[in-house]
Amino acid sequence: MILRAVVVCLFFAMPSFAGPSVVDSAGRTVSLPQPAQRIVGLAPHIVENLFSAGAGNKLVGVVSYSDYPAAATAIPQVGSAFSWSLESVVALSPDLVVLWGSGNGMAALPQLERLGLKVYVSEPRGLADISDSIRDFGLLSGTADIADTNASTFDADIAQLRSRVGAAPPLSVFYQIWNKPLQTVNGEHMISHVIELCGGRNIFADEP
């Protein structure tokens, strides 16, 4: 009887030892045996959001232009957001790699997984996705309290800005991202969402 009681207690105690688990932007479940201690962030926005999640001190690798906050500039770089070195990533022995789906290309995902690396795909499409990512990063790195606080602050700031703009007539906006050839973004891009938040209207929002 005592043995059975011990077994039952151990069974119900097991979930408390389970590592963090979240669903990433690609709909994949990412589970870790324990909170990540060595993280590689493969895009500047990923690095910034990891710092917002309280996981900046766990970053061991970033990419070029990861310059916010200033502490990010002291972290070793493995390349750029569009061209990074797989060998450099592996050499850092990360227990979590945060991949930018469209920037790095999803083609890199199977290769990283074949090497036994845990990968979270980050692809924020809207402003709400930013705070969701921060919370995910906090869960994965064991800094959920910090992440939730900063994500909630971000959401509150967005709501305040939206209320300030109110029902004012929108201003027509053209956002140039490159000059040769001339390039802009459509309404699905995060930039367009920010334009709308600030009271603008992307004149190319309806383009494919």
Predicted segments, located by residue:
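N-terminal signal peptide c-region/cleavage motif recognized by signal peptidases
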Residues: A13-P15
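His/Asp/Glu-enriched short active-site or ligand-binding loop at hydrolase and phosphoryl-transfer sites
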Residues: V63, E188-P208
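Short hydrophobic/charged patches on amphipathic alpha-helices used for structural packing
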Residues: L86-E87, L109, S192
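Short, solvent-exposed loop/turn elements at domain surfaces
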Residues: V30-L32, V47-S52, D67-A71, P181-N186, ...
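Extracytoplasmic substrate-binding proteins
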Residues: G19-V22, R28-T29, L96, W100, ...
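Sec-dependent signal peptide recognition
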Residues: M1-V8
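Short, structured coil segments at secondary-structure junctions
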Residues: A55, A74, L115-G116, C198
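A short, structured surface patch at a secondary-structure boundary
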Residues: Q37-G103, I203
